């Protein structure tokens, strides 16, 4: 199966339309491919100081970010929130320090399909569902939704064939996209308030809801990008 790990160039171009010269732009967790429009960076690796200027070390799950309220015009966070034990501290801090921003996480489609992560090792017979180090399913239905990814998902009966076809058909379905202004709207689906137990029908239905919502809203995001591109050409 074709994999889309690197940022999609068209998404970069789209985000560039919201960023003008002179803006202060913060990237969270820059990794090996820093956001080209970023002027400031923060992350949990102290070693990044050597490669990036304006870099500060932050524990996203618990720290207050070392910036003033609404200091930044734009904040960019790609493949960060799903890795955190407490992404909600990070969300609140992004809303506090920035006026607008963009969040990208792996989509629920990738998190339920086997071979999304350890596909490179052909000798390894067992393939995890999605990425085994991720703590949350994340999807957009007008707000960001977070559902804890329990190990029981490996044993659930999920027909992934249709989901794989979606991933093969359109590279955009590999990710969840969320563009925001003023503050980030989100919902944490919690046990036992929103589902009785991990692995039961309510939990499974939330996963299916996340997958279906992701397909719809990713399609809308792509249409918005294409519309803006056609209006400017």
Name each model-derived stretch.
Residues 14-113:
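Conserved SAM-binding loop
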Residues 88-96, 100-233:
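S-adenosyl-L-methionine-dependent methyltransferase catalytic module, highlighting the catalytic core
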Residues 4, 52-53, 123-126:
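Intrinsically disordered, low-complexity segments enriched in polar/charged residues with Gly/Pro
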Residues 1-19:
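Class I SAM-dependent methyltransferase Rossmann-like catalytic core
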């Amino acid at each position: 199966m074709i994999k889309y790990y690197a940022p999609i160039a068209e998404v970069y171009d789209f985000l560039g339309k919201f960023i003008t010269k002179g803006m202060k732009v913060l990237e969270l967790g820059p990794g090996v491919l820093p956001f080209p429009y970023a002027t400031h960076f923060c992350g949990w690796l102290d070693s990044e100081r050597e490669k990036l200027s304006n870099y500060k070390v932050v524990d996203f799950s618990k720290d207050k970010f070392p910036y003033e309220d609404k200091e930044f015009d734009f904040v960019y966070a790609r493949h960060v929130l799903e890795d955190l034990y407490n992404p909600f501290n990070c969300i609140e801090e992004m809303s506090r320090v920035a006026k607008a921003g963009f969040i990208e996480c792996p989509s629920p489609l990738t998190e339920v399909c086997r071979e999304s992560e350890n596909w490179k090792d052909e000798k390894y017979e067992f393939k995890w569902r999605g990425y085994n180090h991720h703590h949350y399913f994340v999807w957009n239905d007008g707000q960001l939704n977070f559902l804890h990814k329990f190990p029981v998902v490996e044993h659930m009966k999920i027909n992934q064939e249709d989901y794989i076809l979606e991933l093969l058909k359109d590279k955009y379905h590999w990710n969840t996209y969320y563009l925001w202004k003023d503050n980030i709207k989100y919902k944490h689906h919690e046990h036992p308030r929103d589902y009785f137990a991990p692995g039961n029908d309510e939990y499974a239905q939330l996963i299916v809801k996340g997958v279906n919502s992701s397909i719809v809203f990713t399609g809308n995001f792509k249409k918005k990008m294409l519309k803006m591109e056609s209006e400017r050409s």
